[in-house]
Amino acid sequence: MRRIVLDMQCTLFADAISQALVVNDPDFEPIRAETPEETVRLCRSSFAYALIMEVTGYHTPWNLEERLALGKQVKAAVLSCKIVLLVDEKADESLASQVRQAKKDGLIDNFIYASVSPAYLSAVIDTL
C-alpha cells in the first residue's frame, strides 16, 4: 500500500480525491489530515508515499508560501515523500502560474490542476 496524505481545505473535495485515488488504483491508501498542523505528523507516522496539498490564493494556511514551507518540513521528516500541489487553475490563473514556477524551481515534485479527471490524477500520483 502506498499511503497518500491529503491536506485540503474542503472536506468534500478531500473525500472526492480519496475516492478517485482508491477507485483508480487499489494500491493507494489515502489519509486525510484534519488540519495543516497534523500533516507532518501524519506523513511521518504513515511513511507517506505522497502528500497532496490544496493551494488557495486567499486563506492561510492554504496559501502557496505556507504550503511550500509545510512541504519542506515534510521532506525533512520523510525524504522519500513526494510533494504535490493541487490548484484551481480556472479560479486563479496567477496562482496556477506561481505553482508551475514552484515545480520548475524544484520546490515541489509535481502539481495537478483541479480540473483534471480522476484517472489522470491517479496516473500522475502513480508515476511520481
Predicted regions and their residues:
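Two-component/phosphorelay signaling modules centered on CheY-like receiver
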Residues: 11-33
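Output/docking surface of receiver
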Residues: 87-128
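Two-component signal transduction core modules
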Residues: 51, 83, 110-111
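Non-catalytic signal-transmission and effector/linker regions of two-component phosphorelay proteins
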Residues: 1-18, 116-128
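Acidic, metal-coordinating helix/loop segments flanking the phosphotransfer/catalytic sites
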Residues: 34-50, 60
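Short, aromatic/basic amphipathic alpha-helical patches
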Residues: 17-21, 69-70, 95-104
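Conserved phosphotransfer cores of two-component systems
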Residues: 44-46, 73-80
